[in-house]
Amino acid sequence: MKKLVCILVSLVMTFSVTGLAFAEKEQKNETPIIIIPGFMQTNLQYENEDGTFEKVWAPDFLGKLGIVGQNLPDILKSALEIFNDNTEAFGEALMDMMSDLMPKMMCNPDGTSVYKVLPYENDPAKRNMHHIKHSGEEYHMQGYYTFASYICDEGYAKEENVFIFEYDGRFDAITNAESLREFVKAVKAYTGKEKVSLIGVSYGGQIEAAYLHMFMDDNDIEKAVFNVPALLGTNFGDRILNARVEFALDDIVALIEHMSASDTELSTLLKDADPEFFSRLLNGLSAGISEYARYWSSVYSLTSVEYYEQLKEKYLDPVASAEIIKRNDIIHYEMMPKMKETLNECLNRGIYIAIHAGSGLDLVLGGDENADLLLPTEKVTGAVCAPRGKRFSDGFTGAGTECKNPEHHHVSPSMEIDASTAFLPENTWFVEGTPHAMFQFDSYGLELAAKALCTDELKDVHSDPEFPQFTTSKNVNFGVFAKFNESAPGYITKKDSSIIIENLFENNKIKVLSVKAKGLDISFDSESKKILSPGEQIKISFNGEIPNKNAVRAAVTVKYIKYDIISSVAERTFDLTVLNGEKGESDGSIVDNEYYIKDSSGMNIIKKALTIVGNLFDLIFVLSEFLTGDAFRYLM
């Protein structure tokens, strides 16, 4: 329940940054590291006439309870309209309150700030981790403090060599890339180093790409790691500004559980909630957002090209907003079309590139693309993906447009992603089931990012079998992780003779009840009475023959129960591809994914009425938590 706050917050501050935990290393990375946070993840301050500064973002809701009280009557009145199926009024009332709470965040039609609002000063002496940690500034760093502190505390980098780039999240990627250039120069001068390494998260990844597109000739980048980067945008601007939200509640529940990073099964709290309720609420919010943020140039930078022209025509005057249009035209018609070319040129010049993406989830605001909740996987990586509920046909081993090596298999175990078509097939990793920028809650994602940024161990997706191109999340809320003993996660070959199951819980023991395969004529010996402690593994052998086929879809489901508490039987299904024969014939056609499960059950009138009441109480709790500012420690 506590983390449900993300339902409201994430739609304003869509692109969050992650924290990453790393194992201790004997030698610290000597190259300065610059962290580029995600959308609205940096601090903004208003300069008063007397030269003092007032923090305006992230806002201090707890200190503005008077404004909340003034708006409360309208909020309560509009809340009653929910029972008349008018959720939009409630959303509009909430948006009015948000406008009162953050009046200085408005921008002019040309994209400049109405008020003198500035990012924190990008002084390397103040924006390095040593200064930040010892000046008591941890809270103001929001969520990405976790990322920076881990790479320092676990020995990957020195505190004085890790820097945070502060920028105005309302501004476009071109403007922020120009500011990043100045910060890179300042960090080089401060450290005496000739090059720096960058890691950009979400919108920070788009800013990073803009920097490389415009300033690669500066020759000052050693590594560029992209964590769920918004390289080609998303449908956020279209869905919010045009009030076309279709809420993906099931995947929001997954996000809540992921953020909890606990053994608690939070999905039961919202299993009967009505997605339409939240869709109407958010569309009510959208009416206010479209006026409040229509001149935030970043909204257009984050919009994918298929929606950009329509939004530009509807919300931007060609004269008054000429500067917003000019800079975003560069992004959509110069930078994005040349993304593959830019990234490959980086590799040719010796710049290390790694792209980390999430997959296997819906777009939270609506759409049928394979995504990480906020960004379509295809627009993060360039890889062709089947729509949700679909997959490539059996026998498909990749179109091979970017990787033509017949020995490389770049199709995901779910047969939904063809990484052979990605911008960089050999330098792109996918983690299924990890929500957008939530790698700090996933042990695999943490170590993957650590190795890419701070070591030379992962030159490409073939460097280490422990870090294959495709895998599934190891967040504790999933309970178990499974792979076959001789193959990469998600694949099975004739070499395999057993399945390895790991208990992901941190506090609970489990007992595996059964393991069953679909699409394979094999059976598992699951009569073991062994109880798995947290982190412990068990190897279960199977009987039967692996078919002599290649690139054939299958799945395996593990059922288990928590051993030391009263709980229901839980299960997790793992995507599986058989790789055990000659290369088959496939035209790459898209077929229905028989392994895709989407709850589409309806609700009767009584159940719907009870759900509305429950949703309303949920939102009251969400609002109270939101106002304390506690949410920002998770989402920022």
Across the structure, where does each feature detected by a protein language model lie?
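Asparagine-centered strand-capping/turn motif at beta-strand->loop junctions
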Residues: 501-507
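Alpha/beta-hydrolase-fold enzymes
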Residues: 249-320
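Short strand-edge motifs at loop-to-beta-strand transitions and within beta-strands
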Residues: 536-542
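Alpha/beta-hydrolase fold catalytic core
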Residues: 155, 160-163, 171-174, 288-373, ...
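Short, solvent-exposed loop/linker segments at beta-strand-coil boundaries, enriched for Pro/Gly
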Residues: 516-528
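N-terminal non-catalytic accessory region
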Residues: 24-199, 206-259, 362, 372-485, ...
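Short, solvent-exposed loop/turn segments enriched in Ser/Thr/Gly
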Residues: 492-498, 550-554
